[in-house]
């Protein structure tokens, strides 16, 4: 008899400089049945944590602490480890969208988007990461 166990939960790492935003994202991930494997506040920390935790997906703010921005960190993580990112931007202007598109990141979301829009992107992640 074949086992019909559900697939393991999507493992997500958050790179975000604001703790209150991390809490909100963590709550959303829990609601969706995903597993938060860690959170960091800077680009270099994100690169190290991605190597350590090997998440399925990253949630990365454009404006991280320090000199490295989130898109640069996400590009480095994807190049080194093949891990894709959802980039969150307070102001999702054309420059952010263009840089993210050129880097083949998973998605770019404006932080002012409704929670339901962020949830929709995260719900689609397991299917899009496989293909």
Locations of the language-model features?
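A short, hydrophobic beta-strand element within the central beta-sheet of small alpha/beta folds
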Residues: 82-94
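Alpha4 helix (beta4-alpha4-beta5 surface) of REC/receiver domains from two-component response regulators
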Residues: 91-109, 113-120
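Acidic, metal-coordinating helix/loop segments flanking the phosphotransfer/catalytic sites
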Residues: 39-57
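Non-catalytic signal-transmission and effector/linker regions of two-component phosphorelay proteins
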Residues: 1-11, 116-131
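Two-component/phosphorelay signaling modules centered on CheY-like receiver
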Residues: 19-38
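Active-site residues of response regulator receiver
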Residues: 61-63
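Short amphipathic alpha-helix used as the core "switch/output" element in two-component signaling
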Residues: 71-83
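Acidic catalytic/metal-coordinating carboxylates
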Residues: 42, 68-72
């Amino acid at each position: 008899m074949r086992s019909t166990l559900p697939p393991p939960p999507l493992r997500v790492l958050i790179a975000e400089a604001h703790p209150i935003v991390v809490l909100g994202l963590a709550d959303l991930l829990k609601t969706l049945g995903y597993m938060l494997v860690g959170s960091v506040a800077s680009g270099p920390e994100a690169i190290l944590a991605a190597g350590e935790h090997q998440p399925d997906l990253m949630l990365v703010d454009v404006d991280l602490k320090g000199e490295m921005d989130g898109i640069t960190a996400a590009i480095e993580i994807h190049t080194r480890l093949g891990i894709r990112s959802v980039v969150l931007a307070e102001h999702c202007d054309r420059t952010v969208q263009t840089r993210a598109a050129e880097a083949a990141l998973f998605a770019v979301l404006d932080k002012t988007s409704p929670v339901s829009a962020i949830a929709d992107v995260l719900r689609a992640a397991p299917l899009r990461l496989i293909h």
